[in-house]
C-alpha cells in the first residue's frame, strides 16, 4: 500500500502536524480563534501592503500625493488602502483579545510561547508606528517627531540615538525612507516570529478553559477547528469590509488629510487609537525619562506574568476574585484609551495618572496577592 503523502512527504508532514492532524483539546472555546485570525490579518496586511508599495514613493515631496494618486487613479487603490489602514485596527483588536485570553486562562505559564508572543506584540507596534508615518500627513509627521524624540530621554546616548533614527537633525527625507524600509521589512520578521511562536506552542500543546492536562481528550484540528476558524474568518472579515467600504476614515485622524508641515504644530498630537492606552501612561508622568520608562514598562510588564502567578489553579475560570480584578483591568485600559485621546488639561490629567497607577498596581501587586489569597481560602 502506498504511504499517505501528507504524512510521509517532509514538507507536507510539517503542515499536516501543524494544521490537520494536530491533537487539540476538545473543549477550547471561541477565545482560541484569535491566533488563526491574527494569521489572517498578517496575510491580508502583507498582500495589501505589497500592492500599495508598488504605487508609493518614499520621498517627502511626493509621498502624500502618491497615496492620493493610489486612491484616485489605481484600480481599486482606494479599497486596498482602506483595507490596509483598517486591517491594522483589526490586527490590534485581535492581538489584544488574544493576550487577554492568554492572561485570563493562564496561557503565560507556557513561558517560551508567551515570551515570543510579547516580542511579536512589540514588533507589531513598531511596524504600525513606522507605517503611520508613511502617508506624510500632519499627524504622521508630528507623531514621528514626538515619538522618536522620546529616545532623547535616554541618558548619555539619547540625542545621538534620535539623530541616528532621523538620519539628520530633524524628521525629513532620510527618516521617511528609513521608515518605509522598516515598514516593508518588519512584517516578514513578524511572519518568521509567528512560525517560532507556533513551533513552541506545538511543543506543549494548547491550553484549555479548565487549565488542566487534556492529553486524554484530544481531537484532530481538521475538520473540527478548521471549520470553526473559517467561521471566525467570516465574522472578522465582514466588519472589516463594512468599515473599509462604508466608513473608512472612522478610526483615522482628520488632520492626516493635511500634508505634513514642519512649521505648523497640531493643537493635539495623538497616535492611532490602539496606542492611546500607552500614550496616556506616557503623558501621566510629568518627567520625560519617567514617562518613557512607564511607557516601556506598560508593555514589558507582560514578560513578568509567569513569575507573578501565585495561584495553584492555572485559569481564572474558578477564581471569582481574580475575575473581578481582570475585568477591572479591562475597564481601566478602556479608561486609559479614552484619556489618551483627550487634551492635556484638568480633569484628564488626574484621571490618566490614577488609571496608570491602577494599571501597574493591579498587574504587579493585586494579581499575585489575590492569587495567593484564593489559594489560602481553598485550604480552609
Curated annotation (Swiss-Prot):
Record key words, sorted: Electron transport, Heme, Iron, Membrane, Metal-binding, Mitochondrion, Mitochondrion inner membrane, Respiratory chain, Transmembrane, Transmembrane helix, Transport, Ubiquinone
Protein's name according to its UniProt entry: Cytochrome b
Binding positions for heme b b562 per the UniProt entry: 84, 183
Cofactor remark: Binds 2 heme b groups non-covalently.
PANTHER family, sorted: CYTOCHROME B
One GO term of the biological process aspect: mitochondrial electron transport, ubiquinol to cytochrome c
Organism: Aerodramus vulcanorum (Volcano swiftlet)
GO CC term, one of those recorded: mitochondrial inner membrane
Keyword Protein biosynthesis among UniProt keywords: no
Cross-referenced CDD domains: cytochrome_b_C (cd00290), Cytochrome_b_N (cd00284)
Database matches in InterPro entries: Cyt_b/b6_C, Cyt_b/b6_C_sf, Cyt_b/b6_N, Cytb/b6-like_sf, Cytochrome_b, Cytochrome_b_C_euk/bac, Cytochrome_b_N_euk/bac, Di-haem_cyt_TM
Cofactor(s) the protein requires to work: heme b
UniProt similarity note: Belongs to the cytochrome b family.
Chief location: mitochondrion
Function: Component of the ubiquinol-cytochrome c reductase complex (complex III or cytochrome b-c1 complex) that is part of the mitochondrial respiratory chain. The b-c1 complex mediates electron transfer from ubiquinol to cytochrome c. Contributes to the generation of a proton gradient across the mitochondrial membrane that is then used for ATP synthesis.
